[in-house]
Amino acid sequence: MSAEDPEFIANSLIERLVFGFHPYGRPGPNSVEALQRITRDDLVAFHRTWFVPNNSLLAIVGDLTADEAFAAAEKAFGGWAKRDVPTVTFDEPPPPTRRVVVVDRPGAVQTEIRVGQIAVSRTHKDYVAVDMALRILGGEGANRLFGVLRSDRGLTYGASANFRAHKFGGSFIAETDTRSDSTGEALRLTVDEFFKLQKEPVDPRELRGAQDYMAGNFPLSIETPSSIAMQVLNHLFYGLDLEELETYRDQVDEVTVADIQRVAKQFLFPDRLSIVLVGDASAFAGQLKAMGFEQFERIPIAQLDLSAPNLRKAAGDRRD
């Protein structure tokens, strides 16, 4: 996917708005020039700094005893010397703040829409309930965003909301695309669903559907040695108790309608969402104002720089 692809731009920019200059929001190399600046020495230095045994995890799954596994690990890695690993500090993600950024692509007939905010970490005690709330909003299968945007209004072919939980925080991001002439309506309906999840208890059937999906999908994540190893590594990385692998489905079944509304009220900020629109600004600017999004920033696509504090290239770097 190219760095000028509207979907790539929308996905990269929403993470940047949500996380600021925290590494989770930092864009990767988004141009040929950026990739060309990475040298072999850079890769060697990175590997030497971070690829050390005291900064690594190992999971072995298969038909062998613990003693056999330890012996195999010792044989393969016994000579791997420990080294000090640097302590790294990060900028804190910015507090949720309403910000609407329009990346202008004149002539585009579709608009990529992203709506997002900061979220809880993977280790948060309400992780399962939050995950379920976002699945009801926009997860796999039947969900509210798809229902209102596609089934009811016919504004898009797809709509979803993703909960990305990391070690030091996470993000809620809703995404869809629509025709230029329906951009304002699609955005308004998307944001309204965030409010609705707070204000109205979910239907018990919605809850049961999300529970069935999550509980039913879990065995697929532990059905092969490779997938079991990945689950173990993930739990070790996040500092989670491995017993959670045995109790996960119970945790899912214990979530209630009240829990969904509670976490929605506690962790969603519908009036402070970051919003990204990538499309022809002239085609929908008036719609935004009519739908309650009077304040927005317009950035011509040729001027966009995700690494710049103001998201704009320096004057000498612009192509227009």
What are these language model-derived features?
Residues 3-7, 71, 123-127, 183-186, ...:
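Solvent-exposed, non-transmembrane alpha-helical starts
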Residues 69, 145, 186, 263, ...:
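Hydrophobic side chains in well-ordered alpha-helices
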Residues 20, 57-121, 277-316:
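An aromatic/glycine/proline-enriched structural segment found at the starts
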Residues 6-33, 55-61, 110-121, 146-257, ...:
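M16 family metallopeptidases and their MPP-like homologs
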Residues 1-2, 92-104, 212-221:
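Short, conserved secondary-structure transition motifs
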Residues 115, 124-137, 144-147:
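Active/ligand-binding-proximal structured segments within catalytic/core domains
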